[in-house]
Curated annotation (Swiss-Prot):
PANTHER family, alphabetized: ATP-DEPENDENT DNA HELICASE HOMOLOG RECG, CHLOROPLASTIC
Name of the protein: ATP-dependent DNA helicase RecG
One GO term of the biological process aspect: DNA recombination
Protein family per UniProt: Belongs to the helicase family. RecG subfamily.
Species per Swiss-Prot/TrEMBL record: Staphylococcus aureus (strain Mu50 / ATCC 700699)
Keyword Flavoprotein attributed: no
Residue ranges of the motif DEAH box: 392-395
UniProt-annotated binding residues for ATP: G292, D293, V294, G295, S296, G297, K298, T299
Record domain Helicase C-terminal: where: 462-618
Length: 686
């Protein structure tokens, strides 16, 4: 089948007026290869040139005024090739002096009694405007040439093309293309949406703010609807090929294992276990996300599920992003299982004869549970009969890596875990095809971490507070954003310098250093020393963000904390507060921006990771929350997953109804179905 386009053009880009081979090269750099691409190349923002009442204008603000010329323009030259043009306008009975620097050619264009529109900076005291643009209009109404002066689209461009050129070329294209509707009449009427023809023309050349809002609303819904059609269709395909054997676990053995645990499960943990167990009994493969705040006990839930698989005669696999985390999981699971399960660890460090023996035991079924890094997805890693694959911090792996691990078993159930609570907005889009379990309770006995914010000049006081904790026999983390000093970030502390400073303060043997440039063995050695309390203070970059578990650590200092996002700060903070002892987190920062100040304030107000994740998403946007590449998020042109969340829910419901009812596969939707299938369905956002 040929590629289906919903925007069809009778000619190519080269046939547009003003586009030659050189312009084609520039357009291609902007990812514009066809006339359809050009029409869908939307503005990034709009210059608001709406004429305002000068009585309402703020001093030193950028304004647009319209008035009648009542003095002839005068040009004064000074310096080398510099000029100043002065002209006076009458604007609603207010005499305004207009100044234009280095635009002497305007003298020939500005005439007495002419009505012109000027955009520039307003000086209320002097009653003058320093103009940067002028629009000519002798009739007192906007000419066709300046019809879009009120709301002027601004595009992302590169050297070799100007704003006016791309606006003109898009206008040309819109005049001649055939635009097929993406939404049905029924949907448009139901939600009071515009036609795609009106929407695209308005987004490129808005006649009013009201029209622009209507067009933006329609295009945002269209983007979300097409995305959800893709998600729902993939979900249907996934489930149609997702036959699975029912995991016939021994419930009595599982209950006995839970009773032997040295602690009582929280209600949230029990609920999550029950949800997962229902999935394991179902005739289709499980796709579930288990999300919980730092220290909420996700690993225990995973352990119970692994044990259930063992009682049914199946193996389990747990893939984590780092060797340190893999080793910690292996250690904690071995302690939980004792002799009841054979747990093995496979990382890049396991080599030679040891690796060969491990792989043999895995293939013959001797190993019940395999824990490791991406080493688990290598071709020679063959399971006997894996029934459950668990991926921890799954957004840190690419889709391909997760798929390769899943394919280790023909009918494998999949559980994703994350300690980064995912805002419901992202959960519905990134993980739309999954069921979600959430653990929002902390284990009994845990005390909330006390978080404070200190400026750099208060560092000595923070050091005294940390010393007080160390004297109690506790341990501490000190986090820095950089490994070494940077000439570009001279005001940012680096981990090596702070490590050396703290060595002088506490003594060489009491302070350890951890960062990404160390080898795996070096990292393991440092972490082992910290875990064994051979060192008191661990100075580190964010490599300790995920999974590191040292219950005796009760103090964390995060230097230049404003350099991190809320989710990262919360993950770092979660390295303390892992026992019944009171823990502290001190943010050292002197933020220069409102956003930085807001982040520090929020961190001191709440320890709820779910609330923080929502705030982080609002502040940073979905693309930065995980990074578009990792998250699988499409790069929407108009829609915003935060602002348009309600619209996303509606789009999802409408798409689900179309797909699940089968109506989408009838002739009525043939054109749209072919478009989604050819352009979106198998497109990867990795």
């Amino acid at each position: 089948m040929a590629k289906v386009n919903l925007i069809e053009s009778p000619y190519s880009l080269l046939q547009l007026k003003g586009i030659g081979p050189k312009k084609i090269e520039v357009l291609q750099q902007l990812n514009i290869h066809t006339v359809e691409d050009l029409v869908l190349y939307l503005p990034t923002r709009y210059e608001d040139n709406t004429v305002i009442d000068l009585n309402q204008a703020e001093d030193q603000s950028n304004v647009t005024i319209e008035g009648q010329v009542y003095t002839a323009p005068v040009v004064a030259f000074f310096g080398r090739n510099k000029s100043k043009l002065t002209v006076h306008l009458m604007v609603n009975n207010i005499a305004v002096k207009c100044i234009f620097f280095n635009q002497p050619y305007l003298k020939k264009k500005i005439e007495l009694n002419q009505t012109i529109t000027v955009k520039g900076k307003w000086n209320r005291v002097k009653q003058e405007i320093t103009g940067n643009r002028v629009f000519f209009n002798s009739q007192g109404t906007q000419t066709q040439e300046n019809a879009d002066v009120q709301l002027e689209p601004v595009y992302r461009i590169k050297e070799g093309i100007k704003q006016k050129q791309i606006r003109d070329q898009i206008r040309q294209a819109l005049n001649d293309v055939t635009i097929h509707e993406w939404l049905t009449d029924e949907l448009r009427e139901k939600y009071k949406l515009e036609t795609l023809d009106f929407t695209l023309n308005t987004l490129h050349h808005p006649k009013s703010k009201e029209d622009l809002l209507r067009a933006r609303r329609t295009y945002a819904f269209t983007e979300l609807f097409l995305f959800e059609l893709r998600m729902q269709w993939l979900n249907r395909l996934e489930k149609s090929s997702d036959e699975a054997i029912e995991i016939d676990y021994d419930l009595d053995q599982v209950k006995s294992f839970i009773d032997r645990l040295p602690f009582e499960l929280t209600e949230a943990q029990k609920s999550s276990v029950n949800e997962i167990f229902r999935d394991l009994k179902a005739p289709i493969r499980m796709h579930r996300l288990l999300q919980g705040d730092v220290g909420s006990g996700k690993t225990v839930v995973a352990a119970i599920c692994m044990y259930a698989l063992k009682t049914a005669g199946y193996q389990s696999a747990l893939m984590v992003p780092t060797e340190i985390l893999a080793e910690q999981h292996a250690e904690s699971l071995m302690a939980l299982f004792g002799d009841s399960m054979n747990v093995a660890l496979l990382t890049g460090s396991v080599k030679g004869k040891k690796r060969k023996i491990l792989l043999e035991q895995l293939e013959n079924g001797t190993i019940d549970c395999l824990i490791g890094t991406h080493a688990l997805i290598q071709d020679d890693v063959i399971f006997h009969n894996v029934g459950l694959v668990i991926t921890d911090e799954q957004h840190r792996f690419g889709v391909n890596q997760r798929q390769l691990l899943r394919e280790k078993g023909a009918m494998t159930n999949v559980l994703f875990m994350t300690a980064t609570p995912i805002p419901r907005t992202l959960a519905i889009s990134v993980f739309g095809e999954m069921d979600v379990s959430s653990i929002k309770q902390l284990p009994k006995g845990r005390k909330p971490i006390i978080t404070t914010w200190a400026k750099h000049e208060q560092y000595d006081k923070v050091l005294m507070q940390m010393t007080s904790e160390l004297k109690k026999g506790r341990q501490a983390y000190v986090i820095c954003p950089l490994i070494e000093s940077s000439e570009h970030l001279e005001d940012v502390q680096n981990v090596v310098a702070l490590y050396e400073s703290l060595q002088q303060y506490y003594g060489v043997s009491r302070v350890g250093l951890l960062h990404g440039k160390l080898s795996a063995d070096e990292k393991d050695e440092v972490m082992q020393k910290f875990s064994n309390h051979e060192i008191d203070v661990l100075v580190s970059t964010t490599v300790v963000e995920v999974g590191v578990n040292v219950p005796n650590a009760t103090f964390m200092m995060i230097y230049d904390a404003d350099r991190f996002g809320l989710s990262t700060l919360h993950q770092l903070r979660g390295r303390v507060g892992r026992s019944d002892q009171q823990s502290y987190c001190v943010l050292i920062a002197s933020p220069k921006t409102e956003t930085g100040i807001e982040r520090m304030t929020i961190m001191t107000q709440t320890t709820d990771g779910f609330e923080l994740s929502e705030r982080d998403l609002e502040m940073r946007g979905p693309g930065d929350f995980f990074g578009v590449k990792q998250s699988g998020l499409p790069d929407f042109l108009v829609a915003n997953l935060v602002e348009d969340y309600r619209m996303l829910e509606v789009a999802r419901d409408e798409a689900a109804e179309l797909i699940q009812s089968g109506v989408f596969f009838e002739n009525t939707y043939q054109h749209l179905r072919h478009f989604v299938e050819e352009n979106l369905l198998h497109r990867s956002f990795d």
